[in-house]
């Protein structure tokens, strides 16, 4: 024991000597002027109109800050690798040594700590050389240097750099009206290209993620995958860098250091917990973008969610399973993802699906994060050091029971106060609503009651009878013969490929589905694999529904096809006995519905550009499959529609119309599902190709919409029938 203690003491003395030597060595190691001094020089040059001086100083300030950041990262990463926390797990003292064992363990721990500190001191240099005040750090975070630079570049006729600097500043300060005016001015100048408007401070992981999501939303999964995978790689790099930058000096929060009085272990605890808090908050920092008021929720897990869908859409089920299982690491009880996994198991086989595991990088990330959370919640419970968990996926068992009870009590108090305030506000709102509701309802009904255009079509239910707004049910849109012909088309076309591109989620394993898009049907007709006239009928019927929707809802802007397909769903008989799921759970077509909070977030992966939706039924000889509207809680059913040949349901795609489809429990349900947009930029590319193919294949006479003649456009609004569509009274992810 004496020999071991002597070795430790010798090591500690060597560390102290190395640290003092590092003081001398490092002073010459940092020769760059600090960012705050360079920023001050730049502002002074700006004040006297020295534009080249502004450019020189501000560019150097940005480079200096970047160099400091790189130095911290390099030093902390290298020293952590060279001097890890290592306690000898195999060393266990004998009973005779027990009295001194604890002291030796402490010396071993602090010996490693001192060695790493000496390494950092030698690598970083004097603390004063790389410290910025909180105010100066804020200036750089606000991208203030680019505000000065854009003016200076403009003054010295460096237009391309001026545009980039202005855009970079505006991305970080989207409310800055003067910079918006500058950018508008730059756009009018000759010689300015779209590529000049670039963000010089963009984070690679966020750039790749946003690009991947945009491609996914534009129904280009093949192109989206490499960007989403790159976003993951860049995320983990940025995450480790962010964590390393957290290992700075202790923040005393203003002048609290004057009263700070802690012993050795309390001081270590305070600083270490502050560092852990910072590391956990890297989740929020990396999920933030200046263009958004709030960070992306569940940012890292959402990567695997998008990838799972994208891999599914391109037919790579193995990768889809891996991403689904990785997502389930964070949300093991997610109903939709578990259904997706069951679907993949049915496609790939149970054994093969079991052999695919979640990604190791995500497993390690989750394990480390949970261990840190345990320490942070323990410190919150015992020492009262607050910790706000940035993740929604943290298991409840990580939080100490006493803290759970305390948080539950606080939440209940907050909810009670909120409810009391809400009740008062609701009483006021009710009084106002009662006075305006009747006039608004009359206005909406009058607005949406346009002509149905074609003979034989009858209005069955309007918004009032459907207990909502912007809703309609029509009968007689197509004939029985046309229903049968289109149903046959689906069954024949499916043998040449299901044509089902662009769906946002795998479907229930309790039903088989197959379908065909308009363009695919026409191509198969051109190749002689399906009757060409049937494919042409399909094309004409979709155009007919589009015109009816435009007319009935009295739209001032034309509707464009966003996505359309003819699809049949067949119940698998042997799995219907204990079935509890829907064909499609309740959702909203252009936003992500959170039924618990009654909020629908209009952002990808939702198809945010969709404005109106319609479904045209081809048959009713099956059990189940009823379409239903609900409130935002996804539980309160407001109306239900029973499918039958020629019946169409139309509605606006927003939060006013959450809807779902009940399970098909026997037989086959066939329908044409259509989504429309008012924005021509999101017009379906397949539809444009279909239009061109129809012009090539058919004469102008054959291209007429149908042999039916439109009714007089000046006719009065049709009157709805009064009976319930489902034959009974209405009782209180992305196909219709």
Curated annotation (Swiss-Prot):
<dbReference type="GO" id="GO:0019797">
    <property type="term" value="F:procollagen-proline 3-dioxygenase activity"/>
</dbReference>
<dbReference type="GO" id="GO:0005737">
    <property type="term" value="C:cytoplasm"/>
</dbReference>
<dbReference type="GO" id="GO:0032963">
    <property type="term" value="P:collagen metabolic process"/>
</dbReference>
<feature type="repeat" description="TPR 3">
    <location>
        <begin position="205"/>
        <end position="238"/>
    </location>
</feature>
<keyword id="KW-0256">Endoplasmic reticulum</keyword>
<dbReference type="GO" id="GO:0005783">
    <property type="term" value="C:endoplasmic reticulum"/>
</dbReference>
<feature type="binding site">
    <location>
        <position position="659"/>
    </location>
    <ligand>
        <name>Fe cation</name>
    </ligand>
</feature>
<dbReference type="Pfam" id="PF23557">
    <property type="entry name" value="TPR_leprecan"/>
</dbReference>
<dbReference type="GO" id="GO:0031418">
    <property type="term" value="F:L-ascorbic acid binding"/>
</dbReference>
<feature type="glycosylation site" description="N-linked (GlcNAc...) asparagine">
    <location>
        <position position="316"/>
    </location>
</feature>
<protein>
    <recommendedName>
        <fullName>Prolyl 3-hydroxylase 1</fullName>
        <ecNumber>1.14.11.7</ecNumber>
    </recommendedName>
</protein>
<dbReference type="GO" id="GO:0061077">
    <property type="term" value="P:chaperone-mediated protein folding"/>
</dbReference>
<dbReference type="GO" id="GO:0006457">
    <property type="term" value="P:protein folding"/>
</dbReference>
<dbReference type="GO" id="GO:1901874">
    <property type="term" value="P:negative regulation of post-translational protein modification"/>
</dbReference>
<comment type="similarity">
    <text>Belongs to the leprecan family.</text>
</comment>
<dbReference type="GO" id="GO:0060348">
    <property type="term" value="P:bone development"/>
</dbReference>
<feature type="signal peptide">
    <location>
        <begin position="1"/>
        <end position="22"/>
    </location>
</feature>
<keyword id="KW-0479">Metal-binding</keyword>
<comment type="function">
    <text>Basement membrane-associated chondroitin sulfate proteoglycan (CSPG). Has prolyl 3-hydroxylase activity catalyzing the post-translational formation of 3-hydroxyproline in -Xaa-Pro-Gly- sequences in collagens, especially types IV and V. May be involved in the secretory pathway of cells. Has growth suppressive activity in fibroblasts.</text>
</comment>
<dbReference type="GO" id="GO:0030308">
    <property type="term" value="P:negative regulation of cell growth"/>
</dbReference>
<keyword id="KW-0677">Repeat</keyword>
<feature type="short sequence motif" description="Prevents secretion from ER">
    <location>
        <begin position="733"/>
        <end position="736"/>
    </location>
</feature>
<dbReference type="InterPro" id="IPR006620">
    <property type="entry name" value="Pro_4_hyd_alph"/>
</dbReference>
<keyword id="KW-0175">Coiled coil</keyword>
<dbReference type="GO" id="GO:0050708">
    <property type="term" value="P:regulation of protein secretion"/>
</dbReference>
<dbReference type="GO" id="GO:0008285">
    <property type="term" value="P:negative regulation of cell population proliferation"/>
</dbReference>
<keyword id="KW-1065">Osteogenesis imperfecta</keyword>
<dbReference type="GO" id="GO:0018126">
    <property type="term" value="P:protein hydroxylation"/>
</dbReference>
<dbReference type="InterPro" id="IPR044862">
    <property type="entry name" value="Pro_4_hyd_alph_FE2OG_OXY"/>
</dbReference>
<dbReference type="Pfam" id="PF13640">
    <property type="entry name" value="2OG-FeII_Oxy_3"/>
</dbReference>
<dbReference type="InterPro" id="IPR005123">
    <property type="entry name" value="Oxoglu/Fe-dep_dioxygenase_dom"/>
</dbReference>
<feature type="active site">
    <location>
        <position position="669"/>
    </location>
</feature>
<keyword id="KW-0560">Oxidoreductase</keyword>
<feature type="repeat" description="TPR 1">
    <location>
        <begin position="35"/>
        <end position="68"/>
    </location>
</feature>
<dbReference type="InterPro" id="IPR039575">
    <property type="entry name" value="P3H"/>
</dbReference>
<dbReference type="GO" id="GO:0010976">
    <property type="term" value="P:positive regulation of neuron projection development"/>
</dbReference>
<dbReference type="GO" id="GO:0005506">
    <property type="term" value="F:iron ion binding"/>
</dbReference>
<dbReference type="GO" id="GO:0005788">
    <property type="term" value="C:endoplasmic reticulum lumen"/>
</dbReference>
<feature type="binding site">
    <location>
        <position position="587"/>
    </location>
    <ligand>
        <name>Fe cation</name>
    </ligand>
</feature>
<dbReference type="GO" id="GO:0005634">
    <property type="term" value="C:nucleus"/>
</dbReference>
<keyword id="KW-0408">Iron</keyword>
<feature type="glycosylation site" description="N-linked (GlcNAc...) asparagine">
    <location>
        <position position="540"/>
    </location>
</feature>
């Amino acid at each position: 024991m004496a020999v071991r203690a002597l070795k430790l003491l010798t090591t500690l003395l060597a560390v102290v000597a190395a640290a003092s030597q590092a003081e001398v060595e490092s002073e010459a190691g940092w020769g760059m002027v600090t960012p705050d001094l360079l920023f001050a020089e730049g502002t002074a040059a700006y004040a006297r109109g020295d534009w080249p001086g502004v450019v020189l100083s501000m560019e150097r300030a940005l480079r200096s800050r970047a160099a400091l950041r790189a130095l911290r990262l390099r030093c902390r990463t290298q020293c952590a690798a060279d001097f890890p926390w290592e306690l000898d797990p195999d060393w266990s003292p004998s009973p005779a040594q027990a009295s001194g064992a604890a002291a030796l363990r402490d010396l071993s721990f602090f010996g490693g700590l001192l060695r790493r500190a000496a390494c950092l001191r030698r690598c970083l240099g004097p603390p004063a050389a790389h410290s910025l005040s909180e105010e100066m750090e804020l200036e750089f975070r606000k991208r203030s240097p680019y505000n000065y630079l854009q003016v200076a570049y403009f003054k010295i006729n460096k237009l391309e750099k001026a545009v980039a600097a202005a855009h970079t500043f505006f991305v970080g300060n989207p409310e800055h009206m003067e910079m918006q005016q500058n950018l508008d001015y730059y756009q009018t100048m000759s010689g300015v290209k779209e590529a000049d408007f670039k963000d010089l401070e963009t984070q690679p992981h966020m750039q790749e993620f946003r690009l991947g999501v945009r491609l996914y939303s534009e129904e280009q999964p093949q192109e989206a995958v490499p960007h989403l995978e790159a976003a993951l790689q860049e995320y983990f790099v940025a995450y480790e860098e962010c964590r390393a930058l957290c290992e700075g000096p202790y923040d005393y929060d203003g002048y609290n250091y004057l009263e700070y009085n802690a012993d050795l272990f309390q001081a270590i605890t305070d600083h270490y917990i502050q560092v852990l808090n910072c590391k956990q908050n890297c989740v929020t920092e990396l999920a933030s973008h200046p263009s958004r008021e709030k960070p992306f929720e569940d940012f890292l897990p959402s990567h695997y969610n998008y990838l799972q869908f994208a891999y599914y859409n391109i037919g790579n089920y193995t990768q889809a399973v891996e991403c689904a299982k990785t997502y389930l690491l964070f949300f093991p009880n997610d109903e939709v993802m578990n259904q997706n996994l069951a679907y993949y198991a049915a496609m790939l086989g149970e054994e093969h699906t079991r052999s695919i595991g979640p990604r190791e990088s995500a497993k390690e990330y989750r394990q480390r994060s949970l261990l840190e959370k345990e320490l942070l919640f323990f410190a919150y419970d015992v020492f009262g050091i607050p910790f706000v968990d940035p993740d929604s996926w943290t298991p409840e068992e990580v939080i100490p029971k006493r803290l759970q009870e305390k948080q539950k009590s606080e939440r209940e108090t907050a909810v009670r106060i909120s409810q009391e305030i809400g009740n008062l506000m609701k009483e006021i709102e009710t009084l106002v609503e009662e006075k305006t509701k009747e006039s608004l309802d009359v206005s909406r009904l009058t607005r949406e009651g346009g002509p149905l255009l074609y003979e034989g079509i009858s209005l069955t239910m309007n918004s009032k009878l459907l207990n909502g707004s912007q809703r309609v049910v029509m009968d007689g849109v197509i004939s029985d013969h046309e229903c049968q012909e289109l149903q046959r088309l689906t069954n024949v076309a499916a043998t040449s490929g299901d044509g089902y591109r662009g769906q946002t989620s795998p479907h229930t394993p309790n039903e088989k589905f197959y379908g065909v898009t308009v363009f695919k049907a026409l191509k198969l007709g051109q190749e002689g694999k399906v009757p060409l006239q049937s494919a042409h009928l399909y094309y004409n019927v979709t155009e007919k529904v589009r015109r009816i929707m435009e007319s009935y809802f009295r739209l001032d802007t034309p509707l464009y096809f966003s996505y359309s397909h003819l699809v049949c769903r067949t119940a698998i008989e042997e799995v219907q006995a204990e079935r509890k799921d829907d064909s499609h759970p309740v959702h909203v077509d252009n936003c992500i519905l959170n039924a618990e909070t009654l909020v629908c977030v209009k952002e990808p992966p939702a198809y945010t550009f969709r404005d109106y939706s319609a479904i045209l039924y081809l048959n009713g000889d099956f059990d189940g499959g009823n379409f239903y509207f609900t409130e935002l809680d996804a539980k309160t059913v407001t109306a239900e529609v029973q499918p039958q040949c020629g019946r169409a349901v139309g509605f606006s795609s927003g939060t006013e119309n959450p809807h779902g489809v009940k399970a098909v429990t026997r037989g086959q349900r066939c329908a044409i599902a259509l989504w429309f947009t008012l924005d021509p930029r999101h017009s379906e590319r397949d539809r444009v190709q279909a239009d061109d193919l129809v012009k090539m294949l058919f004469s102008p006479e054959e291209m007429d919409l149908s042999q039916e003649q439109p009714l007089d456009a000046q006719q009065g609004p049709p009157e709805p029938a009064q009976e319930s569509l489902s034959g009974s009274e209405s009782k209180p992810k992305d196909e219709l």
